[in-house]
Amino acid sequence: MKILGEVFDRAADLCDDPLQSFLVGLKLLAEIFADLPGGHPGCMIASICYQERLFDRRVLELNRVAVESMNARFRRHLEAIAAVYPPAEPIDLDTLAEMASCVIDGGIIMSRVMADSNRLVQQILGYRALIKRHFSPAQELALQPPPNVTAVNLQARVVSG
């Protein structure tokens, strides 16, 4: 939790625009996880979910509060973004905020299961791309090539089209 606060506070210091600040924060978070030797060491939240019967009610409550706090932090970022950049499609911001938590926790689990520390980084960057496309103004999106289009593919389309 502390690392999320530090990362997104730093991003807010770097950029006043709420969308750009959130995108910078996600990129910084991905970079931090990419720099961890051997990937993220694990996730207490995921462990508690899978082994719930091994933990007492106090630990389960702390887990719930931590998740709610993380979701609320993401929700505040998304509210600030939506106030400036209306979403491309109607979407519940609580769902989008929870998705960030799911991406991070799920990315940690996927990285461990697949023995590939890059999975977490790719999941965060994928969520970042989704947020960018969902909240970017339409005219800005019109100037961007579709995802996964390389310069060579783009040039081939122009020549053959």
Spans of model-derived segments:
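Hydrophobic alpha-helical bundle segments that form small-molecule/ligand-binding pockets
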Residues: 52-57, 67-96, 132-141, 149
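Residue-level recognition of alpha-helical structural elements
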Residues: 15-19, 56-59, 63, 89-93, ...
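Amphipathic alpha-helical segments used for helix-helix packing
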Residues: 20-22, 37-61
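Hydrophobic alpha-helical segments that form the core
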Residues: 41-47, 88-110, 126-130
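C-terminal effector-binding regulatory domain of bacterial HTH transcription factors
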Residues: 137-161
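Hydrophobic alpha-helical connector segments
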Residues: 9-41, 88, 93, 97-100
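Hydrophobic/aromatic residues within well-ordered alpha-helical segments
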Residues: 1-4, 18, 22-25, 66, ...
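Amphipathic C-terminal alpha-helical segment
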Residues: 32, 36, 101-118, 130-140
